[in-house]
Design a protein with these regions (language model features):
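Short, well-structured N-terminal submotif of metal-dependent ribonuclease cores
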Residues: 1-33, 46-59, 122, 131
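Alpha-helix capping/helix-boundary segments
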Residues: 8, 37-38, 75, 102, ...
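Glycine/charged-rich beta-loop-alpha catalytic/anionic-binding loops adjacent to active sites
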Residues: 22-23, 59-62, 83-89
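Acidic, PIN/NYN-like endoribonuclease modules and their adjacent C-terminal/linker elements
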Residues: 103-131
Length: 131
């Protein structure tokens, strides 16, 4: 699976869905996250928790045994296509910059996406079904 920023933030902030997201991650042997998502999550979590946000994110990465993926040229091209197809102001999915890279990683690896919210549900990606 590919894990979106929204799922990581949910887990670190211990939001109501956190346990379900963590369980879904532990049940899958493939746990990919884009380095762009980690930067985005770090920004969000430091805004919410101060410097401890990055420390909590690092702890979650280790605990969940996430595989951090670099951005490839192919992913960059796919992210741009995702923007034109599903981007904010262009489509009701309203993907932002970081979302486009998550989309690209999921699309290029053909892995289902774990996310919180409605945005990716309006795209053509395979999605993780929570139990």
């Amino acid at each position: 699976m590919v894990i979106d920023t929204s799922a990581l933030v949910c887990i670190v902030l211990e939001e109501p869905e956190a346990a379900a997201f963590a369980s879904a991650i532990f049940e899958d042997s493939i746990r990919l996250v884009s380095v762009v998502s980690l930067v985005e999550a770090g920004i969000v979590l430091e805004k919410a928790l101060g410097r401890a946000g990055s420390e909590e994110l690092e702890f979650a990465i280790r605990t969940l045994k996430l595989s951090i993926q670099p951005v490839t040229v192919d992913q960059g091209q796919t992210a741009l296509l995702a923007h034109w197809r599903y981007g904010r102001g262009l489509h009701r999915a309203a993907l932002n910059f970081g979302d486009c890279f998550t989309y690209a990683l999921a699309k290029r690896t053909n892995e289902p996406l774990l996310f919180k919210g409605n945005d990716f549900g309006r795209t053509d990606l395979r999605l993780v079904a929570l139990s």
